[in-house]
From Swiss-Prot:
The chain crosses the membrane at residues 11-31, 73-93, 139-159. It is a multi-pass membrane protein. Residues 32-72, 160 are lumenal. Keywords: Cell membrane, Cell projection, Endoplasmic reticulum, Membrane, Postsynaptic cell membrane, Synapse, Transmembrane, Transmembrane helix. It is found in: Endoplasmic reticulum membrane; Postsynaptic cell membrane; Cell projection, Dendrite; Cell projection, Dendritic spine. GO terms for molecular function: signaling receptor binding. Belongs to the cornichon family. Pfam families: Cornichon. SMART domains: Cornichon. GO terms for biological process: localization within membrane; negative regulation of anterograde synaptic vesicle transport; negative regulation of receptor localization to synapse; regulation of AMPA receptor activity; regulation of membrane potential; regulation of NMDA receptor activity; synaptic transmission, glutamatergic; vesicle-mediated transport. Acts as an auxiliary subunit for AMPA-selective glutamate receptors (AMPARs). Found in a complex with GRIA1, GRIA2, GRIA3, GRIA4, CNIH3, CACNG2, CACNG3, CACNG4, CACNG5, CACNG7 and CACNG8 Interacts with CACGN8. Interacts with GRIA1. Found in a complex with GRIA1, GRIA2, GRIA3, GRIA4, DLG4 and CACNG8. This is Protein cornichon homolog 2. Brain. Expressed in the neocortex, hippocampal formation, and cerebellum (at protein level).
Length: 160
């Protein structure tokens, strides 16, 4: 049983992957909250309720934006660690999501410093559906990755 840099990478990745799973679960809950608030017909004509709904939507979008850069950074750190540890299969499994994160980050709205999740555009049903599907796909990826990292960590520790 040997403790190598690859084993350390897998251990750190397990902890960080658990945090990414919680980030994505929070995204799913937030999008469901937005969808429910969007479809709620109660008090549609009440201006006070409309202001309250808008403030709630802006608050949720602000919290969503705060999780984007940490999620992308943590996943980039995964890829960098696996590159340094020469874990090519694991790096190959993570590269597609890394490229998607880079594409998504560099194709953010050009009108400001907002990464994404604008309060006005997120209430478009198509964008909301897309964001929710994206979150479910990321949850599946991170869950499968978590168990792959767990297996790889044990294999790396036992094989030497």
């Amino acid at each position: 049983m040997a403790f190598t840099f690859a084993a350390f990478c897998y251990m750190l990745t397990l902890v960080l992957c658990a945090s990414l799973i919680f980030f994505v679960i929070w995204h799913i809950i937030a999008f469901d909250e937005l969808r429910t608030d969007f479809k709620n017909p109660i008090d549609q004509g009440n201006p006070a309720r409309a202001r309250e709904r808008l403030k709630n939507i802006e608050r949720i979008c602000c919290l969503l934006r705060k999780l984007v850069v940490p999620e992308y950074s943590i996943h980039g750190l995964f890829c960098l660690m696996f590159l340094c540890a020469a874990e090519w299969v694991t790096l190959g499994l993570n590269i597609p999501l890394l490229f998607y994160h880079l594409w998504r980050y560099f194709h953010r709205p050009a009108d400001g410093s907002e990464v994404m999740y604008d309060a006005v555009s997120i209430m478009n049903a198509d964008i909301l559906n897309y964001c929710q599907k994206e979150s479910w796909c990321k949850l599946a990826f991170y869950l499968l990755s978590f168990f792959y990292y767990l297996y790889s960590m044990v294999y790396t520790l036992v094989s030497f």
